[in-house]
Regions:
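Acidic/histidine-enriched, glycine/proline-rich intrinsically disordered or flexible terminal extensions
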Residues: 179-202
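Short, hydrophobic secondary-structure boundary micro-motifs
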Residues: 66-70, 88, 126-129, 176-180
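Conserved, structured core segments of small domains
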Residues: 199-309
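Hydrophobic pocket/interface hotspot
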Residues: 7, 169, 248
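GST-like fold's C-terminal all-alpha helical module
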Residues: 76-171
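Short amphipathic alpha-helical face segments that pack within enzyme cores
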Residues: 1-5, 140, 247
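Residue-level recognition of oxygen-bearing side chains
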Residues: 53, 161, 174, 247
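GST-like domain detector, emphasizing the conserved glutathione-binding G-site
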Residues: 1-110, 117
């Protein structure tokens, strides 16, 4: 799950082969003899078959919220992937580990969770004020623990900050996208894309973005524009909200009708280096999203925009 989360975060799309682990296809084992998921095969044939490595690769392509720069995550990830997962497996799947004490592993896991929760008393995220790779790498395992012991997880007073932290991930619209399912893949069969509710953005037509005049003037001084939409920065949202021409009027009415001086930026998508992906909003309509800053040189022109435009 954390690998898919990072692909979503980075604005990437991949061919999706859902694997039935009891019947691993030969094509998977040819790519990675480990026989574990995830396995990411790049266009040059490079194989990445560790979830943390997939996360780091994805965020190296685009990291709009700066997860890789938010702090040193390695120690927490090592604790999660080592000691915590050890106790989680033996607590959740006791029947697979004869002779192991479920209660002992529960107590040990809860001590680790309490330590993480203590961190969250001081800051919103595990490494400080901003979300980091550690948060993204750990939350799916904390969710597994809660599923294994919902009453104990909810009742423990020490875990209140951790529960609030976990719920930020579970309540985010991206969680529903992570939970999308596909039928097990077979050679020659259908190969959907992930995320399933997104599509590529055509590069042969312009994109548009509505910007407050002051924000655009500041961007021209710095060389990059980093606002997602009115009042929300790229680092907060994770992408810059763009529109196709026929969507501009409704976007203006929703976000900018009372905003004062507004400019319509026309963007050349071929001059963008950050990933572009058309994502579905709750109504199902697709909007183009830019998963990185907008360089000034990619803006073909800008004109004042109002409800009369």
């Amino acid at each position: 799950m954390r690998a898919r989360w990072a692909l979503l975060e980075a604005g990437l799309s991949v061919h999706w082969r859902e694997i039935e682990l009891k019947h691993k296809p030969a094509e998977m084992l040819q790519c990675s003899a480990k026989g574990t998921v995830p396995v990411l095969v790049l266009t040059d044939g490079t194989v990445i078959d560790e979830s943390e490595a997939v996360m780091r690769w994805a965020l190296a392509q685009a990291d709009p919220r700066g997860l890789l720069q938010a702090g040193e995550a390695s120690a927490l990830i090592a604790e999660n992937d080592g000691a915590f997962k050890h106790h989680l497996d033996r607590f959740k799947y006791t029947d697979r580990y004869p002779g192991e004490s479920r209660d002992e592993h529960r107590d040990a896991g809860m001590r680790i969770l309490a330590g993480w929760s203590q961190r969250l008393k001081e800051h919103a995220w595990l490494l400080g004020a901003a979300i980091s790779l550690a948060d993204a790498a750990l939350w799916p395992f904390v969710r597994q623990w809660r599923l294994a012991d919902p009453e104990g997880f909810e009742a423990d007073g020490q875990l209140a900050p951790l529960r609030e932290w976990l719920n930020r991930f579970l309540d985010d619209p991206s969680f529903e996208r992570l939970m999308q399912r596909a039928d097990p893949w077979s050679s020659g069969g259908l190969q959907p894309m992930f995320p399933a509710d997104a599509t590529a953005v055509p590069l042969d037509q312009p994109l548009f973005h509505l910007a407050l005049k002051g924000d655009w003037e500041q961007a021209r001084e710095t060389g990059t524009y980093q606002w997602s939409t009115r009042g929300m920065r790229l680092v907060e949202v994770g992408f810059i909200h763009c529109s196709w021409q026929e969507q501009v009027a409704k976007t203006f009415e929703r976000f900018y009708a009372d905003a004062g001086e507004v400019l319509l930026l026309e963007i050349d998508p071929t001059r963008l280096s950050a990933p572009l992906r058309a994502d579905a909003i709750p109504t199902g309509e697709l909007f183009p999203h830019l998963y990185g800053h907008l360089p000034i040189e990619a803006v073909r022109g800008f004109t004042p925009y109002s409800s009369d435009s």
